[in-house]
Amino acid sequence: MIIPLLPWYVFTMICEMGARGVLAVVLGSGFKIILTGVILTVLYLVIQYCIAGAIAGKNPFKCIWNMLPAYFTAFSICSSSAAIPVTSDCTRKNGIPDDIVDFTIPLCSTVHMCGSTIKLAVSAIAVAYLTGTPLPFAVYIHFVLMQGIAAVAAPGVMGGVLMASIGLLESIMGFSPDQTALVMTLYLALDGYGPACNVTGDGAIALIINKFFGKKQTPSVQ
């Protein structure tokens, strides 16, 4: 009921801030903020797959290549849950058997929100600096840790992590309604790369799960 109305709320807040001249301060740096988020999510995936590849004994970059259809599907539809069929097919190409895929991918689509968490953290920290309210480093760490917990309970749909973390923006970061609306604007400006990172990372988790709990004889990476 709430999430479909979120764009309208953000739109009204943007209009009000635009009339007061606040919006231009943040959106002037919007491209840099989004680019920073994209770079961090890609770096996260490379590290994640290097670790998973070392554990599973597979080429991490070949595994990432096999997961690209899932990445671009989630990027286009902005949803981890809706991309489950494509993510499952891509994970099988990495040599993961059906029983591991059918357990890991649906579960991770609702609890593994790494990309969305990174994106929201970047947006929140950027807004804090751009609005002249930088906070101690310990506050950022506290926010990121609590946000990671909140993301586990968030639905795998567009804006799910954002809605689950609004209370943290106000209670931990001390954001005003205007600052919270700016975070929403940056978060939703290019929502796709968060879910894209989420589903691609699910494949790395499947590699690790298969190593410890899968059958010894598994198909090779295609």
Can you say where each PLM-predicted feature lies in the sequence?
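Membrane-embedded alpha-helical bundles that form the substrate/pore pathway
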Residues: 3, 73, 109-116, 154-157, ...
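Small-residue-enriched core segments of transmembrane alpha-helices in multipass membrane transport
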Residues: 30-48, 66-73, 141-154, 162-172
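Transmembrane alpha-helical segments and their short flanking loops
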Residues: 121-222
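Helix-loop-helix junctions within the multi-pass membrane cores of secondary transporters/permeases
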Residues: 69-151, 206, 219-222
